[in-house]
Amino acid sequence: MVLFNSSKVLLLRHSSISSRGGGHWDFPKGHIDDGETEIQTALRELGEETGIEQVKVVDGFRDTITYTFSGGQEQIGKEVVFFLATTKESKVTLSHEHIDYSWLDFDSAFSRLTYDNACQVLRNAIEFYANI
């Protein structure tokens, strides 16, 4: 979930024990549970990872990134779906999966995000939000 609070965006720093490539900065996200829609997953993961539940999802924004990683002897493909939401909450309660968070202005967020594809998602979200 790309989450805006005024002109800032929330980024989380993953702990090294919770994921491959730990220590990277990214948006709140996670795996879909059986029976969930994509948006239900995004909202659940946002709540679990940040404690933030009072959000307004911005209708019409849906972005995806795809990538592969090595899973032993095979390459594993993954697609991540992002939605855009706004909140007035700024207090974050981190899950065990994360070690830090930052509410950053957009320029600083581009510098902090670890992966280029996440930067593109942020660009797309900013452009979409500016045009609604």
Could you say what each language-model-derived stretch is?
Residues 86-88, 120, 124:
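Glycine-aromatic-enriched surface loops/turns that form tight recognition elements
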Residues 124-131:
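C-terminal alpha-helix
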Residues 1-27:
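N-terminal strand-loop-strand
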Residues 93-122:
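NUDIX/MutT-family hydrolases
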Residues 26, 77, 103:
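Short aromatic/basic micro-patch
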Residues 51-90:
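Active-site segment of metal-dependent pyrophosphate-handling enzymes
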Residues 3, 13, 82-86, 105:
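Short, well-ordered beta-strand micro-motif
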Residues 27-61:
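The catalytic Nudix box helix
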